[in-house]
């Protein structure tokens, strides 16, 4: 008791003071002595803030398992005796969690004694808590490291390739991304492109060997497909997986899911997305169906349509798997019942099954509901599908357009469903290009002219079309092309250059839709009119006398383009307007197949006595149209050829009618023709085969190295011909080889051999359709080589009696001039006229044909209206030298010749074959004559039919070789054929503004005045050439050769220069004009039928020595021929449907496009591809700069025969009717 009071001693006092200093603090903060623990804790907490705070917070983030371990470790540690460490040293640095975590810490310890010890001995707790807080962090770190190691091992396993393709390019990873009933899809990698791919393993254990082989072939075929809306196939091979053979497919990896997953996620698809994705699915299906042979998906559904994430487009997948699925589920419902068309259950289906499935896909996309979800099993679905009951979800479709499309796709009858083309042309799937084309008036289905409106969207009006600012224009079916119309609009400034493609595409789609609609209506009307049991009429009518064919033809029903009654066809369709093909019946030389039943009257029927046939030069094949009542086309009208297309002209007159009884068509058969023959290095023949399924196949074979059996076997193997057609194909190939070899020998043989080979007994006829029945009636036939070589092997009709003066031609029965003999002697020949009204018998003379070369080719040329003089009798002084037979022997008309003939067709034999024609020099002699013409007079009832044959002006070519070559196109031999009704100048009407589009209307030709006969026949003949018509036309010398003609010539040259034309200047001003002074220039142009000069036809002995120059001509001719054939083949492929359409209408009122084809050249130019012509040619699209009918383009074989390389290289036009210039 005294110690505390002793204040002098510092030690006891300091201890007491220390105790006193420590006691009041708990008294202030605590209510009892049992709370002695918190003060030291507070001190440790104070010291703990400085250093170990982050460490003390770690246990609060551990799991309950780790915390339990901590509690179990801390209990024994707390009961151990703690060394007497000062609280200042150990306690502050190793403190457990702060007091804020005290209640959880109590739960960690979980024992009352621990709490007592903790409260009574805080130093022990602090010291024991130190080791406890050090050990637990090491245990969770080890577990985390273990988990991290396992994750890395798993990733290494997944990223390690488990399989490799046989070539080592593709790797397979053990990452499964999809699984189906018969396939498993893994992630793969293309090591060449480092692009991820899909590795698909298909189970084929249930397939037989044949089915497995078939599936492998299908997969090989699918590997070549590449389309933006088709999942790409990269590779495939067979593999063994777990002892089972499987097929591995490597395809494009689609990581954004399918349409099915999209519908599950978003439930409702927006109309714009539905439109875009449906259009892309249609494009993919169209690509598949347009392959040869067509590829059917057979299992199209939303599960098989994949989404490409980055581009937002869709692609069709799982191609070719329907074969596998059908075998895998042979005893159950095959495919997906909800998307299967009714005919799928019968396994007799075509492309229509994919259209049905597409309709169901659209239904699911529009409603987000699975089709036939109300059915409980596949049997109920089958009953509904076969009975035509639509799914309940069909009536939930809100958009009428979508509902109409779905209804048209899921019809029970596959013939009533939409086609892919119909769907792509539907307004719902039409792309918004800012261009709209619509009909300005209701379509009656008959008129060839469509009045259309073109509306352009205005961006300033929110994309709506400009009101009352539509461009109205007239589109002539069969004559106009969408590209030409669009390019004219660009040239006229109506649309900008950037809108050329959208406008052309919009016009083309609208016109195609109208034509499809018309075709459906026409077929419906025919089915109503025709009885179903009408059989094809017999078509095996023999031709007139001649050697029988090597094999008889099979009776074949006349096609739509066979109902004609003329011998030679002329194709005067615009080469860019139609997508048809004429190879089946119209060869490149323009000859009609003689097997055409419409051209073969019964054998017992005699021909009309008025139909006399004359023999014309071998380079010609022409006929005169009958001028019946109501016939308003003339030879000039019918002979408007597209010079650049290389096609002959087709002049079907309005008077032609086909028997409406027969329009049913039989299955098409294969047709074969020769397109070219080459004997330069190897003797190679190029043929074109139209297969039974209307496909065009071009193949070549070596005459020396390939046998007909090998060719036929290859054709059968590739399914180009049917096995039943093999024998007929063999016969035709053998005949082709025989005839080609004969022709090649003729080319190399003497003139006598050529003369005998091309005897008048041979008449062009057609090869029959293969195969032919053995008992069919024999017919005359011509091989495909004869058709392709027809330009230089055209044979005249059989000889007959000469024309008597008392047998004039009546207007109703004009004569037909198949192939006459043409005399050639001197360098400059001019035609001599022949009139059907003759006072003297025409002298009969032996006929001979020109020896012609294999490289020669026909050159059809354009023409305009024909100026015809009155009947001109022959002069008695006409030379009758048997060695120079300029006479025209008249041949009796065989029964095969029609009563109604077509317009003249002329084939140019060879524009460049100079040396070859010299062999005929010794056989021919000059036959000069002069024809003086009378003034015009009104037309009389008697038709004038002068045939002008060439007579020669004695002039040397040695000093004027270049001049004569440049004048080649101005000095052709022009046989002029007339009729009682002739066409005047085909002037174009003044341009009118139809809406905003400048349209020029063409008028019907009227009758021109005929010129009376002249009783005299002079020594020298010069036919008049046409003056300038419209802006540019042919030129000619005037009667006196005065300044008027020179001025007209200069104007013509200037007009030609505006079109990019190179026209030679007049070089023979000093020459005396050959036309009589009293002969006026005719008021309408003469047709340009031929385009070669006498530098190539009338030869001298000097030219035969220039072999080097001839070789250049042959090379140039061969190049032009190849170009011509390629153009013709392309055009024929494009024109098939249109020509069939036009022919099928011949039984009804024919459209004006057929009646007056001469307007085709004067109305619109061919399409000029963008960037392929200079600016001057682009500007020539203006109406004021169009070339006249007498102008020809020289970008095809029908160009000028001049020797100038510059003019050959240019793609301009040249005047072809300057006959009066030498």
From Swiss-Prot:
Modified sites of kind Phosphoserine: 95, 328, 332, 572, 1014, 1196
InterPro entries: CCTL2_WNK (IPR056865), Kinase-like_dom_sf (IPR011009), Kinase_OSR1/WNK_CCT (IPR024678), Prot_kinase_dom (IPR000719), Ser/Thr_kinase_AS (IPR008271), WNK_Ser-Thr_kinase (IPR050588)
Annotated localization: Cell junction, Tight junction
Chain spans, region Disordered: 1-165, 525-562, 626-659, 747-809, 877-896, 927-976, 1000-1087, 1166-1222
Cystine crosslinks: none
Short motif (RFXV motif): ranges: 996-999
Phenotype of the disrupted gene, per the record: Embryonic lethality. Hypomorphic mice do not display hypokalemia and metabolic alkalosis, but show low blood pressure and increased Na(+) and K(+) excretion under low-salt diet. Phosphorylation of OXSR1/OSR1, STK39/SPAK and SLC12A3/NCC is significantly reduced in the hypomorphic mice.
Superkingdom field: Eukaryota
Keywords from the UniProt entry: ATP-binding, Cell junction, Isopeptide bond, Kinase, Nucleotide-binding, Phosphoprotein, Serine/threonine-protein kinase, Tight junction, Transferase, Ubl conjugation
Catalysis: reaction(s): L-seryl-[protein] + ATP = O-phospho-L-seryl-[protein] + ADP + H(+); L-threonyl-[protein] + ATP = O-phospho-L-threonyl-[protein] + ADP + H(+)
GO cellular component, one term: bicellular tight junction
Cross-link (Glycyl lysine isopeptide (Lys-Gly) (interchain with G-Cter in ubiquitin)): 154, 172, 183, 223, 238, 325, 384, 390, 447, 451, 990, 1123, 1136-1137
Family in the record: Belongs to the protein kinase superfamily. Ser/Thr protein kinase family. WNK subfamily.
Main function: Serine/threonine-protein kinase component of the WNK4-SPAK/OSR1 kinase cascade, which acts as a key regulator of ion transport in the distal nephron and blood pressure. The WNK4-SPAK/OSR1 kinase cascade is composed of WNK4, which mediates phosphorylation and activation of downstream kinases OXSR1/OSR1 and STK39/SPAK. Following activation, OXSR1/OSR1 and STK39/SPAK catalyze phosphorylation of ion cotransporters, such as SLC12A1/NKCC2, SLC12A2/NKCC1, SLC12A3/NCC, SLC12A5/KCC2 or SLC12A6/KCC3, regulating their activity.
Quaternary assembly: Interacts with the C-terminal region of KCNJ1. Interacts with WNK1 and WNK3. Interacts with KLHL3.
Protein name: Serine/threonine-protein kinase WNK4
Protein's organism: Mus musculus (Mouse)
Lineage of source species: Eukaryota, Metazoa, Chordata, Craniata, Vertebrata
Underlying gene: Wnk4
């Amino acid at each position: 008791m005294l110690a505390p009071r002793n204040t002098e001693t510092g030690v006891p006092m300091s201890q007491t003071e220390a105790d006193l200093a420590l006691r009041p603090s708990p008294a202030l903060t605590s209510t009892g002595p049992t709370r002695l623990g918190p003060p030291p804790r507070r001190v440790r907490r104070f010291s703990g803030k400085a250093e170990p705070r982050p460490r003390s917070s770690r246990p609060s983030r551990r799991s309950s398992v780790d915390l339990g371990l901590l509690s179990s470790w801390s209990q024994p540690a707390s009961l151990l005796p703690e060394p007497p460490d000062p609280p200042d040293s150990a306690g502050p640095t190793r403190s457990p969690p702060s007091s804020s975590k005290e209640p959880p810490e109590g739960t960690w310890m979980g024992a009352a004694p621990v709490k007592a010890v903790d409260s009574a001995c805080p130093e022990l707790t602090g010291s024991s808590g130190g080791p406890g807080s050090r050990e637990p962090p090491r245990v969770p770190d080890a577990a985390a490291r273990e988990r991290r190691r396992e994750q890395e091992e798993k990733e290494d396993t997944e990223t390690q390739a488990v399989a490799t393709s046989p070539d080592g390019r593709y790797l397979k990873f053990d990452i499964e991304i999809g699984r189906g009933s018969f396939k498993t899809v893994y992630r793969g990698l293309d090591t060449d492109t480092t692009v991820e791919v899909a590795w698909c393993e298909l189970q084929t254990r249930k397939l037989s060997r044949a089915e497995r082989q078939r599936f492998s072939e299908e997969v090989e075929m699918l590997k070549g497909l590449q389309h933006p809306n088709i999942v790409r196939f990269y590779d495939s091979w067979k593999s063994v997986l777990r002892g089972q053979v499987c097929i591995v497919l490597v395809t494009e990896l689609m990581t954004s899911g399918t349409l099915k997953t999209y519908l599950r996620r978003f439930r409702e698809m927006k109309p714009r997305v539905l439109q875009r994705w449906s259009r892309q699915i249609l494009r993919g299906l169209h690509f598949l169906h347009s392959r040869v042979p067509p590829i059917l998906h057979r299992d199209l559904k939303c599960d098989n349509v994949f989404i490409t994430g980055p581009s937002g487009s869709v692609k069709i997948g799982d191609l070719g798997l329907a074969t596998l699925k059908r075998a895998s589920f042979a005893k159950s419902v095959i495919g997906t019942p909800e998307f299967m068309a009714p005919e799928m259950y019968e396994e007799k289906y075509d492309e229509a099954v994919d259209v049905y499935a597409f309709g169901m896909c659209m239904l699911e996309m529009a409603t987000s509901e699975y089709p036939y979800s109300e059915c409980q099993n596949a049997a109920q679905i089958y009953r509904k599908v076969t009975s035509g009951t639509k799914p309940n979800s069909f009536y939930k479709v809100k958009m009428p357009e979508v509902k109409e499309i779905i209804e048209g796709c899921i019809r029970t009858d596959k013939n009533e469903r939409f086609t892919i083309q119909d769907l792509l042309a539907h307004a719902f799937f039409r792309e918004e290009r800012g261009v709209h084309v619509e009909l300005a008036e209701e379509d009656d289905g008959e008129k060839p002219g469509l009045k259309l409106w073109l509306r352009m969207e205005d961006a300033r009006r929110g994309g709506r079309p400009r009101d009352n600012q539509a461009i109205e224009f007239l589109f002539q079916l069969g004559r106009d092309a969408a590209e030409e119309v669009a390019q004219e609009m660009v040239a006229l400034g109506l649309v900008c250059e950037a809108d050329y493609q959208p406008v052309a595409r919009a016009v083309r789609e609208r016109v195609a839709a109208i034509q499809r609609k018309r075709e459906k209506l026409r077929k419906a009307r025919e089915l109503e009119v025709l009885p179903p049991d009408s059989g094809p009429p017999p078509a095996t009518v023999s031709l007139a006398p001649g050697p029988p064919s090597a094999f008889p033809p099979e009776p074949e029903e006349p096609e739509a383009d066979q109902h004609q009654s003329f011998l030679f066809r002329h194709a005067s369709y615009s080469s860019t307007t139609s997508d048809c093909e004429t190879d089946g019946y119209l060869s490149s030389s323009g000859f009609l197949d003689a097997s055409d039943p419409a051209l073969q009257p019964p054998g017992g029927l005699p021909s009309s006595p008025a139909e006399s046939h004359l023999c014309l030069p071998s380079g010609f094949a022409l006929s005169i149209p009958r001028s019946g009542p109501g016939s308003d086309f003339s030879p000039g009208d019918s002979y408007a050829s597209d010079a650049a297309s290389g096609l002959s002209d087709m002049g079907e007159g309005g008077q032609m009618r086909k028997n409406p009884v027969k329009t049913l068509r039989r299955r098409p058969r294969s047709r074969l023709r020769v397109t070219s023959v080459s004997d330069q290095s190897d003797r190679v023949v190029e043929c074109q085969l139209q297969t039974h399924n209307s496909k065009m196949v071009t193949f070549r074979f070596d005459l020396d190295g390939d046998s007909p059996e090998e060719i036929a076997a290859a054709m059968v193997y590739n399914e180009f011909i049917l096995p039943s057609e093999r024998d007929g194909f063999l016969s035709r190939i053998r005949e082709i080889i025989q005839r080609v070899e004969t022709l090649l020998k003729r080319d190399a043989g003497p003139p006598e051999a050529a003369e005998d080979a091309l005897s008048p007994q041979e008449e062009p006829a057609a090869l029959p359709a293969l195969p032919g029945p053995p008992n069919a009636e024999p017919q005359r036939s011509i091989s495909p080589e004869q058709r392709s070589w027809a330009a230089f092997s055209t044979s005249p009709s059989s000889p007959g009696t000469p024309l008597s003066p008392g047998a004039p031609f009546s207007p109703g029965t004009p004569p037909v001039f198949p192939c006459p003999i043409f005399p050639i002697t001197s360098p400059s020949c001019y035609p001599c006229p022949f009139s059907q009204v003759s006072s003297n018998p025409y002298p009969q003379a032996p006929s001979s044909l020109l020896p012609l070369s294999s490289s020669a080719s026909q050159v059809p040329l354009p023409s305009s209206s024909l100026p015809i003089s009155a009947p001109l009798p022959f002069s008695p002084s006409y030379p009758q030298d048997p060695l120079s037979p300029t006479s025209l022997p008249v041949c009796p008309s065989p029964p095969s010749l029609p009563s109604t003939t077509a317009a003249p067709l002329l084939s140019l034999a060879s524009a460049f074959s100079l040396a070859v024609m010299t062999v005929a020099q010794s056989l021919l002699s000059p036959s000069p004559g002069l024809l003086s013409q009378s003034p015009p007079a009104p037309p009389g009832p008697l038709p004038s039919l002068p045939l002008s044959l060439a007579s020669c002006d004695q002039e040397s070519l040695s000093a004027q070789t270049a001049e004569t070559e440049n004048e080649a196109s101005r000095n052709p031999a022009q046989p002029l054929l007339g009729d009682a009704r002739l066409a005047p100048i085909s002037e174009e009407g003044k341009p009118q503004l139809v809406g905003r589009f400048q349209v020029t209307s063409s008028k019907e030709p009227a009758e021109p005045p005929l010129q009376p006969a002249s009783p005299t026949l002079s020594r020298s003949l010069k036919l008049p050439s046409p003056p300038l018509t419209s802006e540019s036309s042919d030129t000619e010398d005037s009667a006196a050769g005065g300044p008027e003609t020179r001025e007209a010539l200069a104007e013509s040259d200037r007009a030609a220069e505006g079109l990019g034309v190179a026209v030679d200047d007049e070089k023979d001003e000093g020459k005396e004009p050959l036309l009589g002074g009293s002969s006026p220039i005719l008021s309408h142009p003469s047709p340009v039928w031929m385009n070669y000069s006498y530098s190539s036809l009338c030869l001298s002995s000097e030219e035969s020595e220039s072999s080097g120059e001839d070789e250049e001509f042959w090379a140039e001719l061969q190049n032009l021929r190849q170009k011509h054939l390629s153009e013709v083949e392309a055009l024929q492929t494009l024109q098939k449907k249109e020509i069939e359409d036009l022919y099928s209408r011949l039984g009804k009122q024919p459209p004006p496009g057929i009646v007056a084809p001469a307007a085709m050249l004067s109305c619109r130019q061919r399409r000029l591809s963008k960037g392929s012509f200079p600016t001057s040619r682009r500007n020539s699209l203006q109406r004021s700069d169009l070339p006249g009918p007498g102008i020809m383009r020289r970008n095809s074989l029908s160009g000028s025969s001049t020797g100038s390389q510059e003019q050959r290289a240019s793609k301009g036009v040249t005047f072809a009717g300057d006959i009066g210039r030498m």
